[in-house]
Amino acid sequence: NDFAQATSLLYNAPIYMDDSSGISMPEIKAKIRTINQDPKKEKIGLVIIDYLQLMTTGQRSENRVQEISSITRNLKIMAKEMNVPIIALSQLSRAVEKQGNNSSHRPQLSDLRDSGSIEQDADCVLFLYRDSYYASQNPDGAEVDADTAECIVAKNRHGETSTVPLGWDGAHTRFMDVDFKR
């Protein structure tokens, strides 16, 4: 059966997850080094941090903006030192919710939460956006396509910025190529 095959494939895949709360940069580095030094395991090829703002510096700090700046700077250094790409997910500020006056809630770099250093240190910044999410706030009452989304390439240090149209499958919480047939 397909489910059993997929489960087996994922179980045996070289994917390492750590759901430690409040993990610090030194802890992440140590865990990556431990895995990379184990001859029985594949080296880490990608690090994904789900929610940058849950990380800590490992030191006491009363200024969250400075702490996030330190984290993003150290993530950049770690990516170069360990030769591994890092994807860090971040929350947007509430300002994007209040942008109804200009009839567009499309996120901008200035909407990244807690620090301008996220924008500064990142090589690439992507935003996912769906018009249908804000349809009830649409002042002109225009219909929006619930099956479409956008990937906004807001920053690209090594290439162009643009907006890429995507398909949206809300029933499965899945973004896909617009030409993908369900």
Task: Report the location of each language-model feature.
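Phosphate-binding/switch region of NTP-binding enzymes
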Residues: E67-R182
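Conserved Walker B
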Residues: L52
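Cytosolic-facing regulatory segments adjacent to core modules
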Residues: N1-K43, T57, T163-P165
